[in-house]
A protein has these predicted regions:
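Accessory interaction regions appended to the cores of large information-processing enzymes
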Residues: 1-260
Length: 260
């Protein structure tokens, strides 16, 4: 079996390995986990979803807006009851909230967006509850296909304390990693470098620090949230995601030839 844990230092992993062996009599090994990417948008768009196979009908118009970093997903209804009955509006809101919506760059989870119901249509005879689920999901996807999507990756906030002799090496490493950093004085001959950098490249840096400082350097890492990915094209190519082929998250609408 597999258990996923947040990335830890080598010493912590060794302690955990010993504890598991002592308590449960099990020998375990640790492998490098994968980075969890997310997606958002950087411009406002309107997405339209229409679902009208024979004897079914629903149409949903959604406004997709970028949110503040770390704000997560927010959903609202700003639709007149003259356009769409309140019960149908509540149903659309429920369908927005119930699903983990996926982006169109890599199929990763969406975050830091506001999605607002602004209009919709129902049929007095043919509309069923499931029709609005289909129309809602398709409206989200259709909007995303129009938007300027942004791939996000997790970042660490870091603090590195090293002897002055190793500052040049550390700064070169952080520049190579695409990290933003500042330097400040510490006690004696030591210097503290603080900043933020991608988890994907800085997560295993402790081993390098130990090697070039001969065990005297101290690196502290803390999660700092998600930031725009530093190597977007490379990650997108690796995922090879094609939104038009994702049958679980369709991007198109469904119309009935000749009407319902």
């Amino acid at each position: 079996g597999e258990i996923h844990i947040r990335r830890m230092g080598e010493i912590q992993l060794e302690v955990l390995r010993c504890i598991i062996k002592e308590r449960f009599g099990m020998n375990v090994s640790f492998s490098t986990g994968s980075i969890i990417y997310k997606e958002t948008i950087e411009n406002t768009v309107e997405g339209v979803g229409h679902f009208e196979p024979l004897r079914h009908y629903a149409e949903v118009h959604l406004l997709l807006e970028p949110g503040e970093p770390g704000s997560g997903m927010r959903y609202e209804c700003h639709c007149s009851e003259d356009i769409l009955d309140k019960n149908w509006q509540r149903l659309v809101y429920t369908h927005l909230c119930e699903k983990m919506h996926r982006g169109v760059l890599t199929g990763s989870e969406l975050t830091d967006m506001k999605i607002t119901l602004v209009a919709g249509r129902a049929h007095p005879k043919h509309t069923e509850g499931g029709d609005f689920r289909q129309a809602t999901y398709r409206a989200v996807r259709q909007g995303l296909m129009q938007a300027e999507s942004v791939l996000l990756e997790p970042f660490y906030a870091f603090s590195l304390e090293v002897n002055r002799d190793y500052v040049g090496r550390a700064m070169t490493d952080f520049e190579r990693m695409g990290a933003a950093f500042n330097m400040q004085e510490a006690d004696g001959d030591n210097v503290v470098i603080t900043g933020e950098g991608p988890v994907s490249v800085i997560g295993n840096y402790q081993a390098e620090v130990n090697a070039y400082t001969k065990g005297t350097g101290r690196l502290v890492l803390m999660m700092a949230g998600y930031r725009p990915c530093h190597n977007t094209e490379e990650v997108i190519e690796k995922f090879g995601y094609e939104p038009e082929r994702d049958t679980r998250n369709p991007v198109d609408s469904v119309f009935c030839a000749g009407g319902s």
